[in-house]
Amino acid sequence: MKPSIYSLTRDELIAWAVERGQKQFRATQIWDWLYKKRVQSFEEMTNISKDFVSILNDSFCVNPLKQRVVQESADGTVKYLFELPDGMLIETVLMRQHYGHSVCVTTQVGCNIGCTFCASGLIKKQRDLNSGEITAQIMLVQKYFDDRKQGERVSHVVVMGIGEPFDNYKNVMCFLRVINDDNGLAIGARHITVSTSGLAHKIRDFANEGVQVNLAVSLHAPNNDLRSRIMRVNRSFPLEKLFSAIEYYIEKTNRRVTFEYIMLNEVNDSIKQAQELADLTKTIRKLSYVNLIPYNPVSEHDQYSRSLKERVLAFYDVLKKNGVNCVVRQEHGTDIDAACGQLRSKTMKKDREKVTATK
């Protein structure tokens, strides 16, 4: 199976071309065809010799993904189900915001983090995506814009889809360098957010990278007892270890950390828990932000339901009174399979039923 050429950074593409007897500018031309003209095949690169196009075709594919399902919400949110070369399925989401077009990408097939409220973890991790497969998600959404011919572009990226990004650290970092490259898609680092469930040692590594990319942490509970029950990762990286890494990140980068907090009715949304959360983030208040997220129910996790509006507002009020920077997140795609992993899970179930029916 040939790798996608999207898996190479610009420097890696230059080195690859030079090793094959080409001048550096040839790699620059290829890069422009890929990320500025956004061609879908090497044959469209009209200023590249046929011999070198043949070498490119022997070595790489362009976009390795195949579109299986597209769902569009009334609010303009678009959810894509893509098929990988090995037949596995991943999800990507386009969200139209007032500040631009944001794309949520997937980094793994399945997830091993084991959050008890999440659709992504219903299917265990089967493999990591390589950087080309992650970049390809952005490229296909951008193709959707290009085909519309309205001058739209992917302006923001959130690495919050299926999988734990820091469990696929090397490929995610390569992806970030590709989409941030000023000579390509040029998506600003401050318009990119990577979300982790709390792999403390990788947060420290990320701090040392020197990138301006935003960091979000999926917190979802204000104490170890509850967090260990609803997020298995907390057993390996309890809050003390996690917050030590977060403090290191803030000290090293002077950048704000966003805490994601899904509101689960009568599980993590009490006044007492709001005060616990305020106390937990007290020492990093100036460089932290809490995002209160309405829960998208998952049929397989029927022990959870969405917090009632009055409980969310009461929780929010406690945080604000304690000086916590916070917001209740705007919902997107509520009329489609909005929760991360839902569309993939449903499609896989249908595929299995079709196979069973033909036997």
UniProtKB/Swiss-Prot annotation:
Binding positions for S-adenosyl-L-methionine per the UniProt entry: 163-164, 195, 218-220, 296
Cofactor(s) needed: [4Fe-4S] cluster
EC top class named in words: transferase
Gene Ontology cellular-component annotations: cytoplasm
Pfam families: Radical_SAM, RlmN_N
Nucleotide-binding keyword on record: no
Enzyme Commission number(s): 2.1.1.192
Reactions listed under catalytic activity: adenosine(2503) in 23S rRNA + 2 reduced [2Fe-2S]-[ferredoxin] + 2 S-adenosyl-L-methionine = 2-methyladenosine(2503) in 23S rRNA + 5'-deoxyadenosine + L-methionine + 2 oxidized [2Fe-2S]-[ferredoxin] + S-adenosyl-L-homocysteine; adenosine(37) in tRNA + 2 reduced [2Fe-2S]-[ferredoxin] + 2 S-adenosyl-L-methionine = 2-methyladenosine(37) in tRNA + 5'-deoxyadenosine + L-methionine + 2 oxidized [2Fe-2S]-[ferredoxin] + S-adenosyl-L-homocysteine
A GO term for molecular function: 4 iron, 4 sulfur cluster binding
Coiled-coil regions listed: none
Entry annotated with the keyword Cell membrane: no
Primary site of residence: cytoplasm
Function field: Specifically methylates position 2 of adenine 2503 in 23S rRNA and position 2 of adenine 37 in tRNAs.
HAMAP family recorded: RNA_methyltr_RlmN
NCBIfam families documented for this protein: rRNA_mod_RlmN
Family: Belongs to the radical SAM superfamily. RlmN family.
Protein name as annotated: Probable dual-specificity RNA methyltransferase RlmN
Originating organism: Streptococcus pyogenes serotype M12 (strain MGAS2096)
